[in-house]
Amino acid sequence: EQKEQQFALDQANKWQEISQYMEILIKGQKKETNGLRIPSDMKPAYFEWIIWRSILAIDSLVNSPEQVRKFKIDADFLPIFTAPGGTADLVAEFKDYRLAVEVTLSESSRQEAMEGEPVRRHVADLCQKRDIPTFGLFLARKVHTNTAETFRHGLWYYDDDSPVDLKIVPFSLEEFKNLFDWLFENKIENKAQKLRILLESCLQGKDSLTAPEWKKTMKETIKNQILVSNSL
């Protein structure tokens, strides 16, 4: 556990490597790139692992690195398997909010069928804690419009018919990478808080938008945040 804590502390210094791994996934590269490669049969596990590392790099966590990840790692902190079903892939707890992260390599119209209900259920389960707000972050190489539409309708009903409004934001991996790179290239302070502000911005006004409009708005929200900050 102490070694994993040290591994976690090192991640902010490894942000460029983390970003390169994201790039490998985005482009589907099979060959070694800058000394890094993802075994083809391990892509789903590496996707979870890379995003876990990105959250450790963002830091400000209240829960331990081990509690954030739901997948098993080996002695070199490499992933062995993907997270089991029944829970979010990653759960990061910050001082004033909780972030449930779900990742998928599926891109077709099957994406919504495979991910829509489980992701919403996992976020709803965490919302029952009610101690701090819970946000969901859904990451895919490409977010299918029907998946975005499912998350746009945030309402979920528990078994006793009580409702909860789920705050789930779907980003493409490229959008998340752009945001991640910006946080570190510009040495942004309180990265976790900046992430929350951006998630809240993406959720604003979604009820009056169509799914394609919402996807476009989220892309522009990230782009504008980066452009505005870079021009200061």
Task: For each feature predicted by the language model, list its residue ranges.
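Catalytic core segments in nucleotide and nucleic-acid processing enzymes
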Residues: 3-230
